[in-house]
């Protein structure tokens, strides 16, 4: 039902603009050819799409998937995607995945923190990690010739981290300060509230960082248990792009990740369902000069056929702030840019000329089996109703 609602929103977005393009083109327009419904650049765009490197995917015996795209570059990016985020946590251990990410680069049984930093620096590489609601990701950017070392470092980090008590206490303080910083970022606060009300009493409603009381109590045993429970072959994908040989990557995966545990008998536990609840939450503070608002409908999961149309609709609505001006088309403009400005800037023009908001940003957040499609905006309190009205009209 919700996906149908999102599809309806996408149709409402496209159809009026098709009509407006017909009216705007005119018989003498040399740029947009309405008769065929295509741009002259469509053939070139098709050729570019056909030139995308082939994606190769191979599974290991323990269930880990290996994926690559070889574009023949001199550099590469390789990362390990793990199904382990706040959606896989409960109220007691919420925040553990993010805490574990902080501990990733604090030393392993083979490398101290300093040794790891120096090795990455001497390679001219970049090592990083992040946690989302459904995944923890560790990745490295390096020269293609250093792919074997990059994969070995990633394997060492996730399998041999020392998780020292002193480092845990130090990172505990870092995370608590990070939480204070997040509270001052009103956009992040709004999106946490959006998830909390859209997915009430479900795992997707929890924050990634977790509550303060959990961060203060998480210990080494909690981190080890989380690794033991979630860092299994079927939950992982080793992916690389750039100057990457798939066969080489597959051999490296077998060497460094082949001993990871596979799924237990009976398979991995199913992902807990997260039902969408249409609702509203308002946090009022009259001392604040501006209102920060997010409006969303339930969208589709990553593998749903509606995902691509929703991504296109998200791009068409786009984003705007006052520094962009009113979206007036200047000459000369390419055919593609002209079309995008004609189609994508209507809401921006309304917001600008009506002085309805300071900024807005369309978003499409996808999860495994659900998602949120909507708009985030920053408005004066007196213009909220008008801005929401025009947003709904564009949908």
Where do the model's predicted regions map?
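Short loop/turn motifs at secondary-structure junctions and domain boundaries
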Residues: 47-50
